[in-house]
């Protein structure tokens, strides 16, 4: 990490993170007790929020697998498309609506690829509803293809970073990078 320019404040090592044990600081010799990650407050909070915990990365990768593509929509009046799509995403993030329109993925894909400011506006919406945003943007990305999928995966990755779910953030970023051919 130091070679990459990342400041390392402290190093701790442990034999196992799935069972109780001991950590050691190799620089100072200090030690302490560890407990399984499954017993942590973060794990309890993630489960309470509906997260699925699994021991296998492959199970997490499947959460991003493409599903039936969203149906096509006529763009029509761009201003109406922007306002209704933003409203529908806001409703999904705030829980005002449990129903997600079948065309929301398509409309969101059009918005986030049409202008960087619209894509960035989606990130701004996610700031107050980070956990919901991870679910919404993962779902939207699963229904999209090509560049809209890569942009939705990028938004999902950022949302996962906001809740410190670095594994899912990394998976979304890896999938996005694998689709680099669709980037301009």
Model-derived regions, located:
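Charged, compositionally biased boundary regions
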Residues: 1-184
């Amino acid at each position: 990490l130091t070679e990459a320019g990342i400041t390392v404040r402290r190093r701790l090592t442990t034999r196992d993170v799935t069972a109780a044990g001991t950590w050691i600081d190799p620089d100072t010799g200090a030690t302490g007790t560890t407990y399984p990650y499954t017993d942590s407050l973060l794990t309890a909070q993630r489960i309470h929020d509906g997260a699925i915990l699994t021991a296998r990365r492959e199970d997490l990768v499947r959460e991003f697998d493409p599903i039936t593509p969203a149906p096509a929509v006529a763009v029509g009046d761009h201003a109406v498309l922007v306002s209704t799509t933003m409203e529908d995403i806001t409703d999904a993030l705030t829980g005002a609506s449990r129903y997600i329109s079948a065309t929301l993925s398509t409309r969101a894909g059009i918005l986030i690829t049409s202008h960087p400011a619209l894509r960035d506006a989606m990130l701004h919406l996610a700031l107050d509803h980070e956990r919901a945003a991870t679910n919404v943007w993962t779902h939207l990305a699963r229904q999209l293809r090509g560049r809209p999928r890569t942009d939705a995966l990028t938004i999902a990755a950022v949302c996962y970073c906001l809740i410190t779910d670095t594994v899912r953030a990394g998976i979304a970023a890896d999938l996005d990078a694998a689709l680099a051919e669709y980037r301009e």
